[in-house]
Amino acid sequence: MKNIIFFGDSLTAGHGLPAANSFPSLLQQRLDQESLPYKTYNYGVSGETSAGGRQRLAAVLTRHPIDVFVLALGANDGIRGIPVRETTQNLQFIVDAVRRQYPQGQLVLAGLEFPFDLGPLGGHRLAHYATEFKALFRTLADKNSLPFVPFLLQGVLGRRELNLADGVHPNAAGQRILAENVWQVLGPLLQQAVSS
């Protein structure tokens, strides 16, 4: 049995939902259905920024041998307006640390977009930040040759019926879409690894 670590924030943790409704748990069901020999571990922490993930990483890396590491951090950086350069440095640190400790492991990066509708009050600076924030994930994926989920919240962001009452966190139906978004990239990767 091989291990998949999901390292993220409240989107990964399944904030406000039973653990079984989080997208890593839903992906475990999919893996079991397809008889793929992987166990998922959900290391999502609500409210975590990329800096928090960087601090927490060492403890996570020692808990299980890692075959696949899905990095899904950055949403809280965007909400707080943390400079894109800092977020990029923190995520690069995480990528480097995982590769150093598990050189045979496979990393997958989940991309994000600025989580608010800029609207008429957004202003030029906020629009510029949103553009830079979105681009940092693809740039990081390209630089490190990482399989890339372009937008974790694709099909969910801004749709009231797919989010909790706070309008930010996906509900159970929204988490199912997140699972599908990740599976589009992760599934073929795992199937290829098993067949090779």
Language model region names:
Residues 29, 55-196:
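Alpha-helical cap/lid subdomain in secreted, periplasmic
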